[in-house]
């Protein structure tokens, strides 16, 4: 039996896809080399986007139907300028994850916590997505400007896009396989999902939030369960994105229960 051209194209786009950082922006177009860590094969600092020093919304566009996703941080002027494991050493701090991102389209991580950074501080956020085609990498170079709003209205999920916590996840697992060489030019650039940031509700299938590796505890798990139950009861009344942020349940970009900072 032969596959139709449409079916084959769909299969390739699903099996070998990439992701883009819509907001605040990425180091550069990494599609040809996105399998190369730590920054998708881009070893030169790009445009530094202005972000609030406490938290930042991150909006991704992905064509994967499922991808384990993790966010990491490096502070400094030259983060991620080396290839492979040498460059990955810069990103030792896990901001959030890993979580399981579900559905193709726009995926918003609201209120990604940066701590309490001061004006003028520079750094880079690394996003790793692990899907059927292996690890994919992108980096966000930034400079802190605390006059910038921490929340952005464009950061909303596409219809059908959601995220779920991963119980007992190893926050360092995605970074361990960072490659410094390789060529992903054979990957198809999938385009499924809405290109606009249309609002939708995000389901949460887990009552336990997967916070940063250094902030897991029985008390936090219990509190996260309570937050998830509360959110479930009011889900129909809320619109916008729903995601676990640093152990807290966030709806429409607003942290509902800040459990782990």
Swiss-Prot record:
Residues that bind Cu(2+): 18, 64, 133
Annotated spans, Disordered: 174-210
Essential cofactor(s): Cu(2+)
Signal peptide: 1-17
Residue positions of covalent lipid attachment, annotated as GPI-anchor amidated asparagine: 238
Location (main, coarse): membrane
Keywords associated with the record: Cell membrane, Copper, Disulfide bond, Glycoprotein, GPI-anchor, Lipoprotein, Membrane, Metal-binding, Signal
ATP-binding among keywords: no
Short name of any one Pfam family annotated for the protein: BIM1-like_dom
GO MF term (any one): metal ion binding
Cellular location(s): Cell membrane
Cofactor stoichiometry and binding remark: Binds 1 copper ion per subunit.
Glycosylation sites: 157, 183
Composition bias, Low complexity: 180-210
GO CC annotations, alphabetized: plasma membrane; side of membrane
Protein family: Belongs to the X325 family.
Protein name according to UniProt: Lytic polysaccharide monooxygenase-like protein X325
Primary gene name: X325
